[in-house]
A protein has these predicted regions:
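N-terminal signal peptide c-region/cleavage motif recognized by signal peptidases
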Residues: 22-24
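Phosphate/oxyanion-binding loops and surfaces in catalytic or ligand/nucleic-acid-binding neighborhoods
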Residues: 1, 19, 325
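Bacterial N-terminal signal peptides that target proteins for export
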Residues: 2-13
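Extracytoplasmic/secretory-pathway proteins
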Residues: 26-181, 186-198, 203-778
C-alpha cells in the first residue's frame, strides 16, 4: 500500500492535530516469508524422488517437508529377514530396531520377559532361538549404543530416558576389534564393524573410521550398511575433493543420508571432484549435486547431465526444479499481491522502477523458458517410459506458463494413461488449466469436471503436504480466470480456498473470521455480485462444484454479506439501498460482530479533527441504520444547519474521521495484512464516495453549501474553517516530496482569511484560533 502521510514536515496546530495511529497493522507494513507467496503447479514425480524432497526449488534454504524416507530402514529390515528366515515379518523387525525404546528392550531382556513384552513379534521369536544367540547379543549392544555418555540423554534420539535408568555405558576396556574378529558370521562381522565405526566417528577417532570402512565395506556388497559407513568415512577425510567424491557415492546409493550429504558437501570444487569420477554415471551424479542448490537458471547443467546419463533420475528432478523456478519468476508476480518472485537476485532492482524491472525480467524469463522447452522437446523422443511421461508433463507445463494453451493441451494428451499416479495428478492439473483457459466456465458440466480435477489433487494432499502449495497455486489461477470471465462470486470463493490451502496443514487450526469471508468481495464485488453470493449461500440444491467451492469458504451468517452490500451502497452514495440493506439486519449486529464496537463508538456529527484527545468520547452507540436514516433526513431538509451536519458526517466517514469504519473495513498508515491477502486497496479507496475517503470531496461540497446558505456567522466560521481543513488534507492526500511541495506549495485560501477577518468575533474563532493556524495566512 502506498504511504498516505506526506514525508515533509507539515505545519500543524495543536487543536487540529491529527494523530494517525495504526489500528490494524504495524506502520512499517506487513511482510510474509517469500516462500509463503510462491506459486508452484508442477509437482510430477518419478519413483525415487522421495529422497530428493528437501531439494525441491524453494525460497527457503531447504524445501519443507512432513515426510522422511524410510527406504534405507526397510532395506536393513529385509537384510535381517533374509538372514534369520523368511517367516519373519519385516514390520516386526522395524518395530524392534526403530520403534522400541532401548530401555524397554534391555529391561525386558534382563527380566527375561522379551517374549511377553513383545508377544507375537516374529523377529523377537527368532532372536530368542538358541541358534540365534549371537544375533540377540548384537541387538543388545546396538541398543546400548543408542545412548550417549551423557546421563539421561539418548544418542541420536529425541526422547529422554527415566532419571533412574542405568545407561549401561560401555566399559573403558570394551574391545570392539575383538568383538568383530570373534564373529564368524560375515553378516554380524559387518554390523559390529559398523557399530564400531560409528562409535569411533563420534569419538573423533578418524583413522579408525577410515580403516574399518576400507576393511569391511570396500568390497562389492549390497548391504545398506556400506553407504552408511562410507558417509562416516567421507567426513573423516581431509582431502575435500575426495570427500566430495565419496559423498556423491553415498548420495547415489542410499536415501537416508541425502540431506546430510548436501549439508557437508564442499561447493566450488566441481572440476576437482569430477576428476575423481570413474565413469559417466558418477560424473552425472556430481553435476546433479552441484545443481540441486542453484536458484538461478541452470539449463547448462541439465544438458551436461543428459549427455552423461539420459535416463537419470536426477536429470528429471532438475528439470522439475527449472519448471518450478520459471513458475516462481513468471506466475508469482502475475498472481500474487506481493508482485515479485520469491527468489530475487542482487542484479535485479525491483524497487527503483518496478514496472520496468517486471517487464525486463518477464521478457528474459520467457526467452529462457522457450530455450528450456525446445531442449526438452528435442530430447523427448530419445527417452522412454516414466522419464518420457515426466518430460512430456514438464513440456506441457512450460507451455501453460507461456500461455501456449493449445500446445500445452497437445502435450498433456501425450502423457501415457499408464503413467504413475503422480504424473497422472499433474495431468489433471494441466487439464484443469486447459479448461480454465478454453471452456465456458459458466457451463455446469465444465464446472463439475473442474471439481473432479481439483478433487484428484485434494485426495493426495494428506500423504504429501507439499501439494498444499500446488492447490494454493491452482486455486489462485482459477480465481483469476473466473474473475476475468466476470464471475466474481466463484473467483472470490476460490481465492479464499487458495488462502486456506496456503496455510497448509495448519489450516485446520485457523478458524475463518468475519473479514476473511468478505475480504475478497470487499475489494472486487459490486452490489449485484453480493446478491448473487447470497443467492448461492441460500441455494439448497448446489451442484458438486458449488458445494466444493462453498465448503469452508461461505459465510455462516448472511448478515456478513448484507453488511458488505450496505457498505458498498454507501460508498456508491446510494443511501436508500444502504438503508434498506442495513434495516433488514439485526440492529445489534454492530455491537456483536467484527471490530465495530471498538472503532464505531464516537459521535459522527462532531468532526474528529476539531477535538483534542481528552475531549473525545468513546461511548457513542453507533447504529448504521440510524446513521443512514439521519443522512437521508438531513439531505431532504437541505438547510444550512443540515448541510453543516452532513459535512461533519462525511468528514468523519473519511480516512481522517472518527467513523471511517462506516466506509472501510480496515485502516492503516502502511501496508497491512489485508493488503497482503487481498491486494492494495488504495485505488479503490480513492473512489469511495466520489473521492471523499481520502480527498474529502463530499465533506467540502456540503461545507460550501452550508457556507453559502447560512445567515449565521458562527456557522459560517465553522464552514470556513472546515473548508480550509478539507483543502489542506486534500493537498497532502498523495505522497509529496520536498521538491514537489516547493513547486506547488499549499495555499490557505480565502476561507481562512475570512475566518481571521470577518468571523474573528465568533465563538468558533475564539475556540479554535491558535498561532500555528494563523501562520498559514502570514
Amino acid at each position: 500500500m502506498e504511504p498516505k502521510i506526506s514525508p515533509i514536515i507539515m505545519r500543524a496546530f495543536s487543536s487540529l492535530l491529527l494523530v494517525l495511529s495504526v489500528q490494524f497493522s504495524f506502520a512499517c507494513g506487513w511482510q510474509v516469508s517469500p516462500e509463503t507467496s510462491r506459486l508452484a503447479l508442477f509437482k510430477a514425480q518419478r519413483e525415487g524422488f522421495f529422497k530428493l524432497t528437501p531439494f525441491y526449488y524453494s525460497a527457503d534454504y531447504y524445501y519443507a517437508t512432513n515426510t522422511v524416507s524410510g527406504v534405507d530402514q526397510e532395506k536393513n529390515c529385509l537384510e535381517w529377514k533374509k538372514k534369520l528366515g523368511n517367516n519373519i515379518n519385516t514390520e516386526d523387525v522395524h518395530v524392534i530396531l526403530y520403534e522400541t525404546d532401548s530401555e524397554q528392550f534391555q529391561t525386558a531382556f534382563e527380566n527375561k520377559t522379551l517374549k511377553t513384552v513383545f508377544s507375537k513379534n516374529t523377529f523377537v521369536d527368532a532372536l530368542l532361538l538358541s541358534k540365534n544367540k549371537a544375533f540377540l547379543n548384537y541387538i543388545l549392544l546396538a541398543k546400548m549404543l543408542e545412548y550417549n555418555n551423557v546421563q539421561d540423554t539418548k544418542w541420536e534420539s529425541w526422547g529422554q530416558i527415566r532419571s533412574n535408568y542405568n545407561s549401561n555405558q560401555l566399559n573403558d576396556n570394551f574391545d570392539f576389534e575383538k568383538k568383530i574378529k570373534s564373529s564368524k558370521d560375515t553378516f554380524l562381522k559387518q554390523r559390529y564393524a559398523f557399530l564400531a565405526l560409528r562409535y569411533y566417528f563420534y569419538a573423533q577417532q578418524k583413522q579408525d573410521v577410515v580403516r574399518l570402512c576400507n576393511t569391511y565395506f570396500a568390497s562389492e556388497s549390497n548391504t545398506i550398511l556400506k553407504p552408511w559407513a562410507l558417509y562416516y568415512n567421507a567426513l573423516c577425510i581431509d582431502n575435500l575433493p575426495l570427500q566430495n567424491y565419496l559423498l556423491s557415492k553415498v548420495f547415489n546409493s542410499c536415501e537416508e543420508k541425502s540431506f546430510a550429504v548436501l549439508q557437508h558437501y564442499n561447493w566450488k570444487l566441481t572440476n576437482e571432484t569430477l576428476a575423481l569420477a570413474q565413469n559417466d554415471e558418477e560424473r552425472s551424479v556430481i553435476l546433479a549435486i552441484e545443481s540441486l542448490r542453484n536458484p538461478a537458471p541452470d539449463l547448462k547443467s541439465i544438458k551436461e547431465i543428459y549427455e552423461l546419463s539420459p535416463n537419470s533420475l536426477f536429470l528429471s528432478f532438475l528439470i522439475g526444479r527449472e519448471v518450478n523456478k520459471l513458475e516462481d519468476w513468471i506466475f508469482t508476480p502475475q498472481y500474487t499481491n506481493d508482485g515479485t518472485p520469491s527468489v530475487t537476485f542482487s542484479s535485479t532492482d525491483w524497487y527503483e522502477n518496478y514496472a520496468k524491472a517486471k517487464e525486463e525480467n518477464f521478457n528474459k524469463d520467457i526467452l529462457y523458458l522457450r530455450e528450456l522447452e525446445y531442449f526438452l522437446i528435442s530430447i523427448r523422443e530419445q527417452t522412454s517410459g516414466e522419464q518420457k511421461d515426466y518430460i512430456t508433463a514438464a513440456i506441457a507445463q512450460l507451455c501453460f506458463i507461456d500461455d501456449q494453451v493449445d500446445e500445452g493441451k497437445k502435450y498433456t494428451n501425450l502423457i501415457s494413461d499408464k503413467a504413475n499416479a503422480s504424473i497422472q495428478m499433474q495431468k489433471n492439473i494441466q487439464l484443469a488449466l486447459v479448461s480454465l483457459k478454453q471452456d465456458d466456465l459458466k457451463d455446469e458440466k465444465v464446472q463439475n469436471q473442474l471439481y473432479t480435477y481439483f478433487n484428484s489433487v485434494e485426495n493426495l494432499v494428506e500423504t504429501d503436504h507439499g501439494l498444499f502449495k500446488n492447490l494454493y497455486s491452482l486455486y489462485r489461477i482459477a480465481s483469476s480466470d473466473f474473475y476475468k470471465k466476470g464471475d466474481v462470486v466463484t473467483a472470490g470463493l476460490l481465492s479464499m480456498k487458495s488462502d486456506i490451502k496456503n496455510e497448509g496443514e495448519y489450516s485446520a487450526y485457523n478458524n475463518p473470521y468475519f473479514f476473511s469471508y468478505i475480504g475478497y468481495f470487499d475489494r472486487n464485488a459490486s452490489v449485484k455480485d453480493i446478491d448473487l453470493l447470497m443467492a448461492l449461500q441460500q441455494k439448497t440444491n448446489k451442484t458438486p462444484f458449488e458445494k466444493y467451492i462453498c465448503s469452508g469458504t461461505i459465510a455462516p451468517n448472511s448478515n456478513y454479506y448484507k453488511d458488505l452490500k450496505g457498505t458498498i451502497a454507501f460508498r456508491n452514495n446510494n443511501l436508500e439501498l444502504a438503508y434498506e440493506t442495513f434495516s433488514s439486519m439485526p440492529q445489534d449486529f454492530w455491537e456483536k460482530n467484527y471490530e465495530y464496537k471498538t472503532y464505531l463508538n464516537e459521535n459522527p456529527f462532531t468532526p474528529k479533527i476539531l477535538q483534542k484527545q481528552e475531549e473525545r468520547k468513546f461511548d457513542y452507540r453507533f447504529n448504521k441504520t440510524d446513521f443512514i436514516a439521519k443522512l437521508i433526513q438531513l439531505k431532504k431538509q437541505n438547510t444550512a444547519s443540515s448541510n453543516l451536519q452532513l459535512a461533519h458526517a462525511y468528514f468523519n466517514v473519511s480516512y481522517l474521521g472518527n467513523s471511517w469504519m462506516m466506509t472501510s473495513y480496515d485502516w492503516s498508515s502502511g501496508a497491512s495484512y489485508t493488503d497482503y491477502v487481498y491486494g492494495d486497496n488504495t485505488e479503490n479507496e480513492k473512489k469511495y464516495q466520489n473521492g471523499n475517503y481520502y480527498n474529502l470531496k463530499m465533506a467540502k461540497m456540503y461545507y460550501e453549501k452550508a457556507l453559502k446558505m447560512s445567515k449565521n456567522s458562527n456557522e459560517k466560521a465553522m464552514a470556513s474553517l472546515m473548508i480550509f481543513e478539507c483543502n489542506y488534507y486534500n493537498h497532502y492526500a498523495e505522497l509529496i516530496t520536498e521538491e514537489e511541495e516547493a513547486k506547488n506549495p499549499f495555499k490557505a485560501g480565502k476561507e481562512l482569511v475570512n475566518f481571521y477577518s470577518i468571523y474573528k468575533s465568533t465563538p468558533t474563532f475564539k475556540k479554535y484560533n491558535c498561532p500555528l493556524l494563523s501562520s498559514f495566512i502570514n
